[in-house]
Amino acid sequence: MSTNSDLRVTLYTYFRSSCSARLRIALALRSISYTSVPINLLKGEQSSTKNTAVNPSATVPTLIIEHVDRSQSPITITQSLAALEYLDEAFPDNPNPLLPPISNPQQRALVRSLASIIACDIQPVTNLRILQRVAPFGVDRAAWSKDLIEAGFAAYEAIARDSAGVFSVGDTITMADVCLIPAVWGAERAGVNLGQYPTIKRVAEALEKENAVKEGHWRTQQDTPTEFRC
């Protein structure tokens, strides 16, 4: 793989998007410099030609890797979990891999399972696009989100209580943690009592101290409105 200096990394992102936050944290954790392209979901910019030209799903994030010398075609990844795995595989010499060593398939599967609870069971059914679609049916959007987050967190807690050290799987930050902490931010906004999930709460508190998490936090982005900034 080319060195980081040979590459131009671009992230299409929204400050409050948990999927975008996963990549912001991962890029910081792995010491990969990137340029942000803000996409305002509340203004519908995800459906703009600018965004759909790179992401036909009309979502964020989108990760684009370009060779500075244009010796190869750009790589465009439109799903956050795929992008996280790509960052692990394509930058093997960078610090802080997101998955355990390939020699430990059991631990790798565990990390992926925890990440998938967040990315597959919780996030898709509580994101803005779904909340907007269920609202006409009289659904209480806040209660909907809270119930589904709590169900997912209960599953995560049941697994992580046995696997956690300082973080979700042992004492090293993994892809599971990169997915968990943005979900915790969303849970707090939804009024979830994290005290019900002591392992998640403890791991989240440890993650909040990490510089990469601070850099990826929704309150610190270039498109974060002034009233929400730290």
Curated annotation (Swiss-Prot):
Cofactors, names only: glutathione
PROSITE patterns documented for this protein: GST_CTER, GST_NTER
Catalytic activity: 4-maleylacetoacetate = 4-fumarylacetoacetate
Annotated GST C-terminal domain residues: 104-226
Binding site for glutathione: S17, S18, C19, S20, A21, R22, Q46, V60, Q79, S80, Q123, N127, L128, R129
Transmembrane segments: none
Coarse class of the protein's main subcellular location: cytoplasm
Family note: Belongs to the GST superfamily. Zeta family.
The protein, known as: Maleylacetoacetate isomerase
Species the sequence originates in: Emericella nidulans (strain FGSC A4 / ATCC 38163 / CBS 112.46 / NRRL 194 / M139)
Gene encoding the protein: maiA
